[in-house]
A protein has these predicted regions:
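Accessory alpha/beta interaction modules
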Residues: 1-154, 164-166
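Short, charged alpha-helical interaction segments and adjacent helix-coil junctions
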Residues: 2-6, 10, 14, 33, ...
Length: 271
């Protein structure tokens, strides 16, 4: 069941994206994750969609940004009632990196000009089950582990369940904030303030509602049997966002192509 807007936290990708639209805060979060300096960010794009052919599968990156040296993709990842294996994070990280490279090359630049790339998955679970605070991957030679390909890419998976003592303080505080909402140092305090501001942003509330309604519509297209559940979910979303009884009827008629009488019968059950 989808959360109400005021229930969203930093671990929800919609809220994560809105908080990271603040360039300076985004830069500081990246520095915390990478444990090193990040340059001034040129742009921060959230829910950036890539589609390279008209019939190709599109992808959306939670947070896509760059400085003078690198391009970054930061993803907030929950299990969503799936196993880590079903999420296929390793292959997704490969796909995301290639998409960022193609975006760069599509602007007429040579592969020699490809910037370094960092794909970061901030996981609310242990993605590989070994207990490490993070898992960092670079390409290296199978025959000689000291020989790196040096292609400029790195994929890092963060385990927010880890609270080991050897984790840097600011990263441990970030993990704890993502897990529990507890504010620690200055960075998590600023993130928490940004979350509170976002919850009061009516334009973002409306945007979130539209996304939920769109998702309900997409699910409805693929499940005739589940029409009742789709209508029920849509009614709940409309109520949560303050739509009136009649406004909700009009919304459902439009989405599900039903008569007014049919919708009113459903409203008797679920309103």
């Amino acid at each position: 069941m989808a959360k109400r807007y005021e229930e969203l936290t930093i671990e929800d990708d919609f809220m994560f994206g809105k908080v990271m639209e603040d360039r300076e805060l985004c830069r500081e979060v990246l520095e915390c994750l990478l444990e090193g300096p990040v340059g001034k960010l040129e742009d921060v794009q959230t829910q950036r969609e890539f589609r390279y052919t008209s019939d190709g599968k599109p992808i959306r990156l939670d947070v896509y940004t760059r400085d003078r040296k690198r391009i970054y993709d930061a993803e907030m990842q929950r299990l969503n009632h799936q196993s880590p294996e079903k999420l296929e994070l390793p292959r997704r990280s490969r796909f995301y990196q290639s998409s960022m490279d193609m975006d760069h090359l599509s602007k007429g630049k040579s592969y020699r000009e490809l910037p370094e790339g960092r794909v970061l998955f901030i996981c609310t679970f242990d993605p590989f089950g070994l207990g490490y605070a993070k898992y960092s991957f670079q390409n290296l030679c199978t025959e000689d582990k000291k020989l790196y390909l040096d292609d400029g890419t790195e994929k890092i998976f963060y385990n927010c369940t880890c609270d080991a003592e050897d984790v840097p303080d600011d990263l441990r505080e970030l993990y704890e904030y993502i897990r529990t909402g507890k504010v620690g140092g200055d960075l998590t305090r600023r993130i928490d303030l940004a979350v509170e501001r976002a919850r009061r942003n009516e334009a973002w509330r409306s945007e979130y509602m539209k996304e939920l309604l769109h998702d309900e519509d997409v699910r409805e297209e693929g499940r005739a049997e589940g029409r009742a559940e789709g209508i029920k979910g849509t009614i709940r979303i409309c109520k949560d966002f303050g739509l009136s009884f009649e406004e909700t009827i009009n919304r459902i008629r439009e989405m599900f192509q039903l008569s007014e009488n049919e919708v009113r019968e459903d409203m008797k059950l679920y309103w």
